[in-house]
Curated annotation (Swiss-Prot):
Motif (Nuclear localization signal): 228-242, 449-466, 525-540, 744-762
Listed Gene3D superfamilies: Jelly Rolls
Ranges annotated as biased composition (Polar residues): 56-74, 87-96, 202-212, 402-424, 481-494, 626-637
Coiled-coil ranges (or none): none
Low complexity compositional bias, start-end: 97-108, 465-474
Organism (species): Mus musculus (Mouse)
Any matching Pfam family: CENP-C_mid
SUPFAM superfamilies named in the record: RmlC-like cupins
Family per similarity comment: Belongs to the CENP-C/MIF2 family.
Protein name: Centromere protein C
Domain free text: The MIF2 homology domain II targets centromeres and binds the alpha satellite DNA in vivo. The MIF2 homology domain III can induce CENPC dimerization/oligomerization.
Basic and acidic residues: bias regions: 426-450, 496-512
MIF2 homology domain III: annotated segments: 853-906
Length: 906
């Protein structure tokens, strides 16, 4: 009989498991799959096939003496795994780790028992390829007992099919077989399961303990927790019981068998595999018909993430998830398959919260899937021992809770879209909450940072805690509450960065006070940088990339995770690092710098006090208090010596400008003071000094330069700035400004040279012009170059004498350096002439003797010393030197000066 079914199965493969080049087979919605299968199974009808299957199932189950109930009392994390065909030649049994959809909190699922009879009527429908292939759910094998055959008239459909039908999701139907019964409600499944548990418990007491132990291992994988089975599974189980061979029939292309392909390897589109291994019933026959749908290996939501997402959905619906306390119960019928199978799927520790949220919000079918993870063999032994202690009311209660968890998992598409949008905003929130495995202990911020880097270790530890709790039949309630804000922007008071507090004692080091007082920063960039520095101090240096992502101040301010033991805030590390005040850098006594008082300035000076630029900023109230104290301290130390009176807008009254008046530090010698002193050859007015200095302007709330500026100095007069250092180490500024000589306004005069007439060209007048100017002369004129007849006084006779000396004719001429002496007339009684002095030339001191000298200043400014008295003479002045005296003449101009002299001889 088995060979007959295999032949028809080959025909089915040739007709429907076609290559990718064959056209697609389109089926209408609601069309019965039996109409299509009639061409495949020519002479075999559905009734005859099911009769054979029921017959074989009844014969195999009648050999067993008792039925046993299995229930899950252990929680375990589950993950998806792909079915991989394994040949018997390699000595490994083929296993398909099917994932069961569950609530985020994890609903408890009660295993149902196997009955002796088969269902009378089975309908086949086209199901979702995602549910039937990628999320191959474990189904509950139902065989009606003699007492309960009438109650089971049809196979109940699963909540996954019910959800798919309610949402009217159309899927691409391709070679997918499924049971269809869209009339039976989920409540009938619960009632039938409870009745079956009662019958099985009553019958299980009759069997011996040895048979119970032996049959439990054989039926651990056969008993399923769902109320339906795939057509391929029912068919292959029938073939399993008819033929006992350990060969593998592979109806596909002629290629050699290879090891199990990885999760990302693409198989043939229409590959059809039959595994008939008889190692144990746990590695049962299964058929894999892969499609081109994307693999779900990269989208494995973690149990923590699933719990968080379902918790958010329940808050949006205003429902309290009471079923979260019974999360992740391990199904008893899956214990043996997990023990023998070695799953190749490992949990990725680096899976980010974004991938998990995108995975869970992608489709309703992906939300309904649960995870299967690696479990050591000790877990299964503990599970088998705990299964023997399951009671009747416990099974009924878990069935009701499992049903309620399925009802809560039906979320509308609109809610899913909103959840997907909100999940992207709260990606950081999910990751930090996931790193807290124990809800009753408040973990410090540093410990939570370390657990972020070791996500995989935390998941395994949390999984072990859940399994150990399930073995003792204790359900530990775990309630996680998230308090997050949609808007991450937080309004802050406007920063007043120009206010600086110089008093070191005002920096409060009390952590309680510092936590309450806000820290004001100059701009937003500095605040982000300091947050990064504080976060790096509490984290390991290994994961720098993830630290930068988690250091965002928006996430730290918006996330507050509240546990039952306390509250953990993401802003805790930042506030702790900001509590440490910055060290005040004192001025170096060897470093010189110009400083002047700036009233009400916050950059470096305030009220004639020089402060350090690196001062820890405090709140506005403390700044105002410290400013008042600084003003009073600075006013008490002001000097009284006045240099400038009413000079400038600031009206400085101080001769010496003091440094920082820090009374507590008492280090006034280290602070440099600036002194303004003036030094002049003559007394310089105060306004003159103020005119040269440009002091800093008094402009509050505006950043200005604090240096002292000077107007251009008159360097050609010797005006300069002299910087000196006093004996006390203070810097002194000296301005050297010589007084200017006032110049006298002179009258405009013709200051021609003495020899100007000599060098001047004579003007020749016409005879006609001379006739008009001169009077007519009727006398005879003498010749000036000839001697003149004159009477001698001694003899009284006419004697020719030289009485006229024409121009440019001299009797005596002496030139020495810049001194020139011209004698025009020279007699025994007297002599006349002209004295010329060069620029700044001096004649020298000379004694007169018996003669008398008469001088007339023709041009220039002269310094004349008559005997012992000096005089300043100018053009037009006359003087004479009596006999027996001496005289001296000096030219005060840079030009030649001329004098006319007469010497009287005795």
């Amino acid at each position: 009989m088995a060979s007959f079914h295999l032949d028809h199965l080959k025909n089915y493969h040739r007709r429907y498991c076609r290559s990718s080049r064959a056209p697609n087979i389109h089926t209408k919605k609601g069309q019965n799959m039996l109409e299509i299968l009639q061409d495949c199974f020519e002479d075999q009808s559905k009734a005859s096939f099911l009769d054979d299957f029921t017959e074989s199932l009844t014969s195999s189950t009648q050999k067993k003496k008792a039925n046993y109930s299995q229930s899950s009392s252990k929680k375990c994390p589950e993950s998806h795994s792909k079915p991989v065909p394994v040949s018997s030649r390699t000595g490994e049994a083929s296993l398909q780790a099917s994932a069961e959809p569950s609530e985020a909190a994890g609903g408890s699922v009660q295993a149902n028992e196997v009955h002796h009879g088969a269902s009378d009527e089975l309908d086949l429908c086209v199901g979702s390829p995602v549910v039937l292939l990628d999320a191959n759910v474990n189904t509950l094998q139902k065989a009606a007992s003699p007492a309960g055959q009438k109650r089971v008239a049809s196979v109940s459909r699963s909540p996954v099919d019910r959800q798919a039908s309610n949402k009217n999701i159309s899927f691409k139907t391709r070679k997918r077989l499924n049971f269809e019964d869209k009339v039976t409600l989920s409540t009938a499944e619960t009632e039938n399961s409870v009745l079956q548990v009662e019958d099985n418990l009553s019958k299980g007491q009759e069997g011996t303990s040895s048979e119970i132990t032996q049959k439990r291992d054989d039926l651990s994988s056969d008993v399923q927790s769902r109320s339906k089975k795939n057509f391929s599974e029912l068919f292959l189980e029938t073939v399993k019981r008819k033929s006992k061979s350990s060969s593998v029939v592979r109806h596909t292309a002629a290629v050699p068998f290879s090891p199990p392909p990885p999760s990302d390897m693409k198989l043939l589109e229409d590959e059809f595999i039959i595994d008939r291994s008889d190692r144990s019933f746990s590695s049962r026959l299964w058929v894999m018909i892969p499609s081109k749908d994307r693999h779900l290996s990269a989208h494995k939501p973690s149990p923590e993430n699933t719990a968080l997402l379902q918790g958010k959905k329940s808050r949006e619906k205003s429902h309290s998830l009471s079923a979260m306390t019974f999360a992740r119960n391990t199904q008893s019928d899956k214990a043996h398959p997990i023990e023998e199978a070695q799953l190749s799927v490992e949990e990725n520790p680096a899976t980010t919260c974004t991938d998990e949220l995108e995975n869970d919000c992608r489709s309703p079918e992906n939300k309904m899937q649960s995870e299967t993870a690696k479990t050591p063999p000790a877990w299964e032994r503990t599970t088998k021992q705990s299964q023997r202690r399951v009671s009747k009311p416990k099974a009924a209660e878990e069935l009701r809770k499992g049903q309620s968890s399925w009802e809560n998992s039906n979320v509308s598409n609109t809610g899913q879209d909103k959840l997907q949008i909100n999940s992207k905003r709260n990606m950081k929130d999910c990751e930090e909450v996931r790193n807290e495995p124990n809800p009753k202990k408040q973990k410090p911020a540093l410990e939570n940072k370390k657990k972020t880097n070791s996500t995989q270790t935390n998941k395994e530890k949390s999984g072990k805690k859940f399994f150990s709790g399930g073995s003792k039949n204790k359900f530990v309630p775990k309630k996680v509450t998230l308090t997050s804000r949609r808007s991450c922007r937080i309004s802050q008071r406007p920063s007043e960065w120009w206010r600086v507090k110089s008093d070191e004692s005002s920096v409060d080091r009390n952590p309680s006070k510092e936590n309450n007082s806000p820290v004001v920063y100059p701009n937003k960039k500095k605040q982000t940088k300091r947050n990064h520095v504080s976060k790096r101090a509490g984290k390991k240096p290994g994961s720098s990339k993830r630290q930068k992502t988690e250091m965002s101040p928006r996430v730290q301010k918006s996330l507050n995770v509240k546990d039952s033991g306390g509250t953990v805030s993401g802003h805790d590390d930042t506030s702790r690092s900001q509590r440490k005040p910055l060290k005040i850098i004192e001025a170096d006594p060897t470093q010189k710098s110009l400083a002047i008082s700036r009233p009400k300035r916050g950059c470096k000076y305030r009220n004639n006090v020089m402060t350090s630029p690196n001062v820890h900023l405090k709140s506005h109230t403390e700044e105002y208090t410290s400013k008042t104290q600084m003003e009073s301290a600075s006013n008490s130390e002001m000097s009284k010596r006045s240099v400038w009176e009413e000079s400038g807008p600031s009206r400085f009254k101080n001769y010496e400008m003091p440094g920082s008046s820090n009374s507590e530090m008492g280090d006034e010698q280290d602070q440099k003071s600036l002194h303004f002193t003036t030094r002049s050859f003559n007394m310089v007015p105060d306004k003159k000094l103020h005119h040269k200095l440009v002091l800093p302007s008094n402009s509050p709330n505006v950043r200005r330069s604090n240096r002292i500026r000077l107007k251009p100095l008159e360097y050609w007069r010797g005006e300069r700035v002299d910087y000196q250092e006093s004996s006390s180490g203070q810097l002194v500024l000296e301005i050297i400004s010589p007084s200017s000589v006032p110049t006298k306004i002179k009258a405009q005069r013709n200051l021609g040279k003495v020899n100007k007439k000599v060098t001047k060209k004579p003007t020749h007048l016409n005879s006609h012009e001379k006739a008009k100017m001169e009077l007519p002369l009727d006398m005879r004129l003498g010749d000036p170059f000839q001697a003149t007849l004159a009477k001698d006084p001694e003899t009284a006779e006419l004697v020719p004498m030289d009485l006229i000396r024409p121009r440019d004719t001299y009797r005596f001429f002496v030139e020495q350096h810049g001194l020139k002496v011209f004698k025009t007339l020279d007699t025994i009684y007297f002599s006349t002439g002209k004295l010329v002095l060069g620029p700044y030339e001096e004649k020298g001191k000379q004694h007169v003797g018996q003669d008398i000298l008469v001088f007339y200043v023709n041009f220039g400014d002269l310094l004349c010393t008559l005997h012992e008295t000096p005089y300043k003479l100018t053009t037009g002045d006359s003087f004479y030197v009596p006999s027996g005296n001496h005289y001296n003449i000096k030219n005060l101009l840079n030009v030649e000066s001329s004098l006319l002299f007469t010497q009287i001889k005795r």
